């Protein structure tokens, strides 16, 4: 990971280990300038190339000089732009010149990443592991996919898109573009059987410390998809991901190879862990790697439409630019504010100032409170629900596959063991634990 220093050429910086500037930086395109009405102050052409850069997300710079700055913003509030230099004429940044200035370093980084991918493949293929590229449609996973496609034959890995059902429409378009861009790769989709609107009704909006959404709509569906692809219940898989240390203090502590960090049988390999955004964008722009259009509007992180970890900057841009995508889940947050008895005149401020993101537990939810009692008798585990909001058979697959079913009775595979399950409107939900003392011979199903 290198810092950068500005040259005298328009919009060109030089990556160097001795640089004093190590801020996160991103290219700024015409679409973002138009969105903020910058054409009233600056003159710039209609071009696909970047026109300037933004440091620290909100500070617009031309060769190190801050020429404008964005302040505030939220779901219902558009950021305000403070212009420091009016009458500015912008010209397209030469991607060719930007690459020439940094080609030696970036070519070396590319080769190190490809070698890393090939070495990990050789090591874990000998142990019988399967291989997957975790794909989200964002800049990081697009870069990793490009590197893995260069390093490995297409038949040696799958590309798994974890479709949470909460992505921006633009991201879904990017997924389809990727399939056309890499027609020889094996794309697969992992998706939860529950609709996000249904799960948000059941569990409430996810919070910063209560991020149930990742497990329900991403992690578990991905594991189930890997089992399906390999035919193995205890599937051992190497997952190439786009994790980068620059993204957060927590990720800065990650290793390039993490064994069992997310799943006991999963090895996460992060080829671009040490890449920063400056390096990523220069490489991607020069090599013509597919870019999600969200970045052209200034959205610095793609992902779910409403996320408890997103910034006010991203909240504002996504809701202003992709309001149709954001509305369904933002409506759920607004409903949660109503259940929290937040006065009408304060609700928008409550939502923008992160009130909902701090939630823990079920307080304030229509279905909140303790509704389940548990008892064990004669090798039978019984759950009694004071009330229920959906059919148990719709929820049960989260625990494991149902391999036999007959009306109100079924056989379910949980943790490699078979349980007989019955649902009785009077007695409750019964799991017979007496039949699960040995691993099931059907655990590959």
PLM region descriptions:
Residues 1-134, 139-445:
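Nucleotide-activated chemistry modules centered on ATP-dependent adenylation/adenylyltransferase
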């Amino acid at each position: 990971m290198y810092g950068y220093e500005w040259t005298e050429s328009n919009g060109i910086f030089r990556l160097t280990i001795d640089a004093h500037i190590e801020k996160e930086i991103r290219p700024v395109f015409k679409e973002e300038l138009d969105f903020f009405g910058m054409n009233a102050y600056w003159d710039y052409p209609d071009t696909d190339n970047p026109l300037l850069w933004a440091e620290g997300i909100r500070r617009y710079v031309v060769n190190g000089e801050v020429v404008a700055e964005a302040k505030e913003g939220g779901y219902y509030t558009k950021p305000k732009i403070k212009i420091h230099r009016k009458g500015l004429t912008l010209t397209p940044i030469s991607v060719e010149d930007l690459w020439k200035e940094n080609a030696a370093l970036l070519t070396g980084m590319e080769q190190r990443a490809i070698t890393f991918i090939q070495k990990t493949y050789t090591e874990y293929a000998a142990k019988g592991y399967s291989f997957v590229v975790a794909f989200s449609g964002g800049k990081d996973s697009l870069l990793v996919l490009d590197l893995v496609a260069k390093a490995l034959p297409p038949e040696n890995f799958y590309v798994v898109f974890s479709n949470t059902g909460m992505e921006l429409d633009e991201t879904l378009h990017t997924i389809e573009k990727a399939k056309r861009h890499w027609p020889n790769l094996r794309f697969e989709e992992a998706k939860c059987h529950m609709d996000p609107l249904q799960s948000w009704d059941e569990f409430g909006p996810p919070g910063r410390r209560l991020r149930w959404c990742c497990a329900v709509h991403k992690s578990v569906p991905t594991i189930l998809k890997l089992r399906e692809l390999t035919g193995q219940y205890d599937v051992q898989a190497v997952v190439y991901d786009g994790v980068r240390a620059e993204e957060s203090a927590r990720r800065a502590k990650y290793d390039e190879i993490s064994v069992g960090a997310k799943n006991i049988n999963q090895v996460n390999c992060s080829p671009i862990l040490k890449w920063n955004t400056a390096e990523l964008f220069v490489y991607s722009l020069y090599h013509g790697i597919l870019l999600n259009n969200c970045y052209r509007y200034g959205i610095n992180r793609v992902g779910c439409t409403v996320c408890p970890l997103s910034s006010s900057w991203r909240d504002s841009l996504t809701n202003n630019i992709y309001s149709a995508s954001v509305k369904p889940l933002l409506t759920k947050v607004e409903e949660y504010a109503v259940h929290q008895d937040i006065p009408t005149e304060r609700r928008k401020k409550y939502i923008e100032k992160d009130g909902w993101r701090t939630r823990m537990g079920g307080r304030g939810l229509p279905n909140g409170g303790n509704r389940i009692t548990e008892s064990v008798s004669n090798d039978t585990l019984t759950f009694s629900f004071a009330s229920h909001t959906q059919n148990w058979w719709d929820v049960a697959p989260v625990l494991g596959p149902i391999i036999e079913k007959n009306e109100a009775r079924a056989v379910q595979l949980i943790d490699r063991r078979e349980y007989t399950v019955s649902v009785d409107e009077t007695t409750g939900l019964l799991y017979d634990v007496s039949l699960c003392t040995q691993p099931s011979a059907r655990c590959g199903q």
